Curated annotation (Swiss-Prot):
Stretches of the chain forming a coiled coil according to its record: 197-223
Pfam families from the UniProt entry: NUSAP
Function description: Microtubule-associated protein with the capacity to bundle and stabilize microtubules. May associate with chromosomes and promote the organization of mitotic spindle microtubules around them.
Listed name of the protein: Nucleolar and spindle-associated protein 1
């Protein structure tokens, strides 16, 4: 068979076996294969005189190339395995035709394998032998004479020196070598820093962090102190707490000990340093039995304002607004408290302004004129109003209409007709269409 009669897949396989590029167009592949085989044949004829003597009956170059292709048509490996039988090489054109005619009836695969077994040796075996001899340097002087020796040579190329071993010999870098782990570990240890240096570095880092934290703390303390000083100078807010907070030692009484204030100064300055800690009056126990002995007889648990200590007495009737002691007297009493060596555990420094207690505060009365003078917050209705009776009748009618049909006539149940269903269906479709359009236009449908 010629190369022209082979299929594209077979040509590709042949090219791969020979060692050519197989991924080409059919015409170019054919051309390349023909060139390759012709060159191979020429080199064989030039190099091996014994091969030319053995093959007297070989046809011209093109025919031989064609027959050679048919030899390499099957799987190459199977052919190599079956080469163990020493068979004398016979010309392919003479003896192949009767065998092929006999076996065509059975199976075509057997034909290809038989062809492979008969003649993979003559053309390629010599080429392989030449190359391998150059590499390995085999010394066989009488291997070039005789057809039987060529068969032995072919056997040797296949079995004795496999291709993989040759490649391995050529490329020693491909061999898997186990690394010297000791050297590797030593190199790694050299790269690593010592424990002492590591500890020093860590300590330095920690010191830097601590210093930064200390700086931040000092800054925050300074910033906190500044607003405190400002708050002390400020006038007390009008909204003073009703209840006594936790005991706070203020700076004002200490000053008083050193220098007595004149009597004319107001009592409001006593509350200058007071900052209310209690903002809600819920859940506060109001009994100060130890501190306030005058309220001992009162056992009620009603949440009332904090009972004042005996040092700050009020008038006899707390219900109504009464004549409160003058500011000077209050000031005097406060100064006496500070002067006495305090045996009392609790001193009330809270709400000195008695006007703010709930007993004394007067509720605001409604001012009609002021409310009428203010503008309206709503829009008033203009025009005639509907009569009251008609509106009531309408509501009754609506109510009767809203009663569902199955409640109205439960004895004779109304079956839903086809027309009603159609109407309902059309309405549903309309609604769906509207929703779709709204969604498409980016409108949010409620």
């Amino acid at each position: 068979m010629d190369l022209d009669s082979l299929k594209y897949a077979e040509l590709q396989r042949l090219a791969k076996e020979v060692g050519l590029k197989a991924n080409m167009k059919a015409e170019r592949l054919l051309k390349a294969l023909k060139e390759h085989f012709s060159q191979q044949q020429l080199s064989e004829n030039g190099n091996d005189a014994a091969a030319s003597d053995a093959h007297d009956s070989v046809p011209p170059v093109d025919a031989h190339a064609a027959t050679y292709v048919t030899e390499r048509r099957g799987k190459g490996r199977t052919a190599k395995r079956k080469l163990s039988e020493p068979t004398p090489i016979i010309s392919p054109t003479e003896e192949k035709t009767p065998q092929d005619e006999g076996r065509r009836g059975s199976k075509r695969r057997k034909v290809s394998s038989a062809k492979d077994t008969q003649t993979p040796v003559p053309a390629e075996a010599f080429a392989k032998e030449n190359t391998m001899e150059k590499e390995s340097g085999d010394l066989n002087p009488d291997s070039e004479s005789g057809p039987t020796e060529t068969g032995v040579k072919g056997r040797r190329t296949v079995g004795k020196i496999p291709r993989h071993k040759g490649l391995m010999k050529r490329k020693p870098a491909m061999r898997p070598t186990t690394p010297n782990f000791k050297k590797l570990h030593e190199a790694h240890f050299k790269k690593m820093e010592s424990i002492d240096s590591y500890v020093q570095r860590k300590n330095k880092q920690m010191e830097v962090l601590r210093n930064s934290v200390k700086e931040l703390k000092t800054l925050s303390e300074k910033t906190l102190k500044k607003p405190e000083a400002k708050a002390q100078t400020k006038v007390p807010s009008s909204r003073a707490s009703l209840f006594s907070p936790a005991v706070q030692k203020t700076a004002v009484p200490e000053r008083r000990r050193l220098t007595q204030q004149p009597v004319s100064k107001s009592a409001l300055k006593d509350t200058a340093t007071f900052r209310p800690t209690v903002l809600t009056t819920n859940k506060i126990n109001v009994r100060f039995s130890q501190a306030t002995q005058d309220n001992e007889y009162k056992r009620s648990l009603v949440k009332t304002p904090a009972r004042m200590s005996p040092h700050m007495p009020l008038t006899s009737t707390p219900g109504r607004k009464s004549d409160v002691r003058s500011k000077a007297e209050l000031n005097r009493s406060a100064s006496t408290i500070t002067k006495t060596p305090g045996a009392t555990p609790f001193v009330f420094n809270g709400n000195n302004s008695i006007s703010t207690t709930p007993g004394t505060t007067k509720k605001n009365t409604f001012d009609l004129k002021a409310s009428l003078s203010r503008p309206l917050t709503y829009k008033p209705h203009k025009g005639k109003l509907k009569p009251f009776g008609d509106a009531q009748e309408n509501t009754a009618l609506n109510k009767s209409q809203t009663v569902p049909s199955h409640q109205k006539n439960y004895k004779q149940h109304q079956v839903q007709t086809r027309e009603e269903r159609r109407v309902k269906h059309t309405e549903d479709r309309k609604q769906k269409k509207e929703k779709m359009l709204g969604a498409r236009r980016g409108l949010v449908m409620a």
